[in-house]
């Protein structure tokens, strides 16, 4: 449960394509870390001419130890002013992180209707497979997102660590019954610090030694 690896690559690519210019608010399901060290994120931001605030990112010097930088700081750095997180607990972080944190157990219905349809973007970066009541978790995700907003889901397909593991058609079916548009989908494969993405087609697995990788995940952008 963190923002890093291939999803981070995709987000930086989307930034170059001006995707986030239409996003003013984001809610991450889970109190997410950014899994990257200080030198790496500084270089990547400088390469893309993204302003790098050394004070905001100083906790990344701790990586892989904690406390780390929150995902909200990453979104702020991409120009998104409102970047909240939702979880059962709040991790101890740097006091520079002034973003909102909503305490909520995703096993239960979201009752605060002020949060309904509030966010331009809602993310599930390896979080919603951890609540026992996964249906309620995704119902909450739907309720948090504005009509016409975006949802990003990154979930384990092979070798995950949650209570549930998704098939390659799970999110397709969720999208179909809720009339979501699928903007992008792919598998991404992790081995050590390396990640590659491939089309969301299991036929491509014949080119990969699945015994020699860490994990396979699915990635979706829905509207």
Language-model features: where?
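Class I SAM-dependent methyltransferase SAM/SAH-binding core
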Residues: 25-111
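Short "lid" loop at the C-terminus of a central beta-strand within the Rossmann-like core
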Residues: 32-34, 156-160, 188-190
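Hydrophobic adenine-recognition pocket in adenosine-nucleotide-binding enzymes
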Residues: 106, 124-130
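A short acidic, Gly/Pro-enriched loop at the edge of an enzyme's catalytic core
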Residues: 111-122
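A short glycine-rich, Lys/Arg-flanked "PGG" loop and its adjoining helix->strand segment in the class I
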Residues: 135-150
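Conserved class I S-adenosyl-L-methionine
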Residues: 150-177
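Conserved S-adenosyl-L-methionine
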Residues: 179-191
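Core SAM-dependent methyltransferase catalytic element
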Residues: 194-223
């Amino acid at each position: 449960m963190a923002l890093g690896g291939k999803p981070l690559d995709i987000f930086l690519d989307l930034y170059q394509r001006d995707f986030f210019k239409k996003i003013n608010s984001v809610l991450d399901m889970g109190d997410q870390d950014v899994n990257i060290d200080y030198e790496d994120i500084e270089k990547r931001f400088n390469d893309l001419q993204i302003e790098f605030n050394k004070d905001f990112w100083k906790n990344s010097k701790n990586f892989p130890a904690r406390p780390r930088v929150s995902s909200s700081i990453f979104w702020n750095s991409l120009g998104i002013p409102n970047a909240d997180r939702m979880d059962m607990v709040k991790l101890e972080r740097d006091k520079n992180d002034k973003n909102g944190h909503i305490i909520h157990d995703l096993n239960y219905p979201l009752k605060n209707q002020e949060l309904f349809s509030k966010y331009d973007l809602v993310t599930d970066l390896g979080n919603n497979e951890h609540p026992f009541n996964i249906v309620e978790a995704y119902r909450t995700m739907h309720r948090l997102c504005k009509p016409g907003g975006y949802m990003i889901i990154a979930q384990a397909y092979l070798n995950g660590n949650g209570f549930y593991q998704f098939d390659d058609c799970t999110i397709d079916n969720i999208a179909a019954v809720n009339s979501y548009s699928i903007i992008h989908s792919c598998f991404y494969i992790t081995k050590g610090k390396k990640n590659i993405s491939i089309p969301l087609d299991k036929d491509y697995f014949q080119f990969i030694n699945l015994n020699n990788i860490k994990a396979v995940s699915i990635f979706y952008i829905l509207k």
